């Protein structure tokens, strides 16, 4: 079953196509990453999917509801954490959570239980009586994410939810979200931290200049588009004559990090590595260690955006 289905969805402002005929299919219970550079159309897409703005053209179904014709029905079943902080400055953390539950008509007994659970889960107990205006950026962000779990929802939109969080708190939040997805919650997740997307997302779409340029799982994106490989070799020693021989190998870039370490970058890594090993063996240079560095999502993202930009010029 799909939580989000978009067909030829577009949003135009005058002559500018902010979102240009995109298709999306987000399955229920998955964490779906939505990545793109600044100005790519991410924010406009989120506003379309959360019914904050209507599309210029195209079809949009959210949780099986026609979101263009029945936006209020959609809003009653989703949660949204936008990038801009939203809070009442004079309310305490505890009262912020409780009031948000009241807005969603959550009964008092259930609200009280959920407040305590979320204060514990998001490490907010020690600041429960602190006013929102006195919180740090990271603390406000935690409150903003936590309060969405005061009500029952089937689909959650998160726009840069880890801004201002330290690494430990960030990982704890990501694990919490992954567990929620395993319980059936669908999460639409945007971030500029590509390692986050690689860790949490089941599937990823990359948008650039209003168009979707790739959709796949993180692993499949790396397998499909990860052309260049990086190999590190630790040697017992290397002199200039050997480095000159290595520099003459085609189809690669070699960095000599010190007298004993070299890093090879190549999209023909197997062929290049054989040539390097032959040179080292012929000159009796022992290899202390050899390791391949896997392609990461950030490299794929940059490569695809660069290719997309070049294709549009």
Task: Describe each model-derived feature in a short phrase.
Residues 4-6, 11-208, 214:
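ABC transporter nucleotide-binding domains
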Residues 268-313:
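C-terminal coupling/interaction segments
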Residues 123, 251-255, 286-291:
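A short linear hydrophobic-aromatic micro-motif
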Residues 175-267:
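ABC transporter nucleotide-binding domain
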Residues 67, 236-238, 269, 293-294:
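Short beta->alpha junction loops/turns
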